[in-house]
Amino acid sequence: MLSPEAPYPPAGGGALRTASLVHYLAKRGAVDLIVFRQPGAPDPGKELPAGLVRKITVIDLPAHSRGEAARAARNAGRLARQVPPLVDRFAGFEREVGAAIGGARYEIGVVEHSWCAPYRAVLGEACTRMVLDLHNIESVLHERCGAVEGGATGFAHRVFAEASRKLERRWLPRFSEVLATSESDAERVRAIAPGARVVVYPNAIPAVELPPRADEEVIAFSGNMEYHPNRGAVQFFRQEVWRHLRREWPRLVWRLIGKHPEAVSQWISGDPRIEATGPVDDAVKELARCRVAVVPLLVASGTRLKILEAWAAALPVVSTPIGAEGLPGRDGENLLLAESGAAFASAVSRLLSSSTLRHELGSAGRLLLEREFTWEKAWRKLDF
């Protein structure tokens, strides 16, 4: 398996999905794992459960500035070359990947994320069967970002959308199977690359006991705050939703749960009723302390593990329609859907006003999770 991020600790949607496949494969044979490491990140091997993989190879990415000016300069160069940012960031390590294989032969090779799909050229020489796991569809994500962003940023996303689509058309049909998170994503993949064999493998989380509830007067948004759709969600919620809730509920706290809160500091600083936890060991337990989970995403692709984690905590969810896309959620049954800022605030207030409704929606979400979205249930979709 080759992954651009380590599966452990399984904090965040990408790591959780990758971890689910590592565990699935480890139950069926020996797994050798190749992961990329960002500068300054801890040793991924020390985070893995003992005995989960046979061998781990860590490829260190070169250091680069995370400042806005440096990021803009890098993306300007990528725009000129029409190379999507993540494809560019993880390209050029064929020699290291080949050395990690070291002449071995494998029954299956799994590549995580479409931006690493070009490594199929190296891995395919050693693997009888090649699988590409799409956490989302990059061309769709860039296309949606381009539709909501204005100016130069929107233009860049539209260019990267077309560049991503060209890569998807080229590489997806070259894999034995392509895993998509939902049937709606699978249909999009088939439209982009008609020759690809697509299998729906839903996002899922490990089965967990229902954690004790603290019922603090807190609403929660969880995820990696550095991820562009999450940054946009925080901005939208602060500007269009939070002002309504803050006025109506004078003791209410909005808590951001997840790593890189500094990425959204411009929208959350200066308000003592907005909290940021940073990384947490157990997102489900942290969510169980709250009353409502909010998913105010304006752009997305794939499906949202943040909703699954809220359901695992039996926490009621308010989401935008695109935030809940790909999941069998039903408005008024296991979550509430709202699109505009005022409608979103009204839906949250409706839940805060009724412990009965919170319990009904949270319990229904938990039942749906147990029925369809634990690792063991998701593994039934796989045949390798």
Regions found by a protein language model. Give the residues of each.
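Conserved catalytic-core segment of nucleotide-activated headgroup transferases in glycan assembly
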Residues: V200-A288
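Conserved acidic donor-binding segment of nucleotide-sugar-dependent glycosyltransferases
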Residues: L335-A342, R350-S355
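N-terminal subdomain of nucleotide-sugar transferases
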Residues: M1-I59, A104
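Donor nucleotide-sugar binding/catalytic pocket of nucleotide-sugar-dependent glycosyltransferases
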Residues: R129-V131, S139, H157-L210
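Short hydrophobic beta-strand element within catalytic cores of glycosyltransferases
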Residues: K306-E309, P316-T320
